[in-house]
Every structure is written in C-alpha cells, then in structure tokens.
C-alpha cells in the first residue's frame, strides 16, 4: 500500500538525517540544520531524494496496470488544482517534514538521546509530531525548541499538523484520482455519455450525497470521484 511505502521511505530519510545531524558538532543548545552549511546541504539532498521517491511511488500506483494510458493519467494527477500541483503539495509537505525532524533532532541532541531511540520516537509521534516525547521533555526542561526553530504549531482549522498524514492523504487521493480517471475514460470509449455517482460508505457527507442526486454528463466536465480525501464513492456509466 502507499501508506506502507510512504512510512518506509520517510523514515529511511529520517534515519539518514539523524545520522548526518549527529555527525556534525553543533552546540547542543543551538542545533539547527542551517547552523552548519555542509549539514544543511546533506539534509537538502536527502529531502530532495525523498520528494522524488514519493512522486515516483504515487505515479506508479496511479497508473498501476493501466499502462496504455500512462501519459494521460500522469498528466491528469499532476494538473493544477486550487492553484497548486501534486508536486507543489509534495514539496510543501516534505519541507514541513524537514521542520518536524529538525525540532525532534534538536531535542534529541539536547537530551543526549541515542539515534535509534530518537528515530523510534519520531515514528511513534508521526500523526502528532510536536507531541514527540523528546520534544515535550526538552520543552519541559526549559528549552523552547519549537519556538526557537520557528515551527508552526498549527496550519489552520481542519488542516493536519502532521506531514505524514498530509502526504498519506495527498498520495492516496492522487492514486484514486488516477484509477477513476482511467475508468471514466474507458467508459467513454465504450460509448458511455455520463454516469451516476453512488455512495460507497455510510459516513455522513453532504458533498457525496449531493453528487448522487443528478446524472453526470462526461461532456460537461462533471466531476468524477474521489470528491475529497477518503472518498469511497463510485460511478456506474450510462450509455444511450
């Protein structure tokens, strides 16, 4: 699954960043990636590699066995939506991940935590990274690591403050979009003029309910599910 792949590559990157951070002799109470130019460059290289891996995994799983329409699907999931592309969002969330790692490593350095133990705590707190046990311990001992490194504690109402959750939602949504776009394309090639949308779950959702109330016409550009993250709706094509 994308979640398992994402977990593996994000925490391989975290392991590498912890190792290079511990390699440089940065004063414990002043730790930041930018304190040392070589450290900063090594971290940026690891994050750039992570971004490429996330893009590759997402595109591969979105295309899956539908290689006959590979270029169309990749172009579709990489289109601009609400002013940003898939790559823009991956870049933003991996930058957020880098900041989460920076504050966790700063805490680990202060507390003299072993590399393996620090990595374990980062994995454990991936869904609420600023509640990492070492960050909390450093803060309770009077080291304001979160504010010193200027890490936002919230990204706004309804938005996760976890880069892992954000990337998991984003990539799974893109993969689902790729599959549904292919399904709609094949339906049109087979003579379908539109579709009805049906709920795939009983979870209360006004948007999904609304989409079931009318006949969607392909030529109108009517939206195909998923309509939002975790959407379980599906379509039934309709021909003349």
What are these regions (language model features)?
Residues 1-157, 239-240:
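N-terminal leader/targeting and assembly helices and adjacent pre-domain segments
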